[in-house]
Amino acid sequence: MRVPIENRIGKEGEGFGLAQTWINAGRIRHGARSLGVMERCLELAIGYAKQRKTFGVPLAQRQSIQWPIVDMQMDAHKLRLMLHHVAWKFDRGEDCRQEAFMVKIFGDERSFWTADRCMQIHGGMGLSKELPIERFFRDQRSMMITEGAIEVLRMALARMILDVK
């Protein structure tokens, strides 16, 4: 298809570079969305763990509940810091492909894991449509495919890091 010159975005031959910039922005947004899911899952898991009792003891006092919540909190903090860094580089117009890949891979994988753990903490209620957890679980699984499948991004990131073809 021929595009009239007045409708061209950028200069001739620079389309791929522009597309990479837009794709990087999408991967950064993936990370931000993943962080939002992680934070909401944490709120739900913490609230439920404090309220729900089994055998007279709140779930929050059980190590099998505490440790995943700690890991969820640490992962959210890591992703938040990664997002600040990649957004800073992106805003400055610096090359941030590696960081954008890492944010997408880490964010998608860990937000899916967080939704899974939140679902597990809630037991059967985590599967119900009354709570947003089952939707987070499904949505975050699909995020690992869109804007670049995480396996492909991991392979491309390895090539960048190792400087191999």
Model-derived features with residue positions:
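Short Ser/Thr-interspersed hydrophobic loop/turn segments at strand-loop and sheet-helix junctions
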Residues: 1-3
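Alpha-helical interface subdomain recognition
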Residues: 5, 12-165
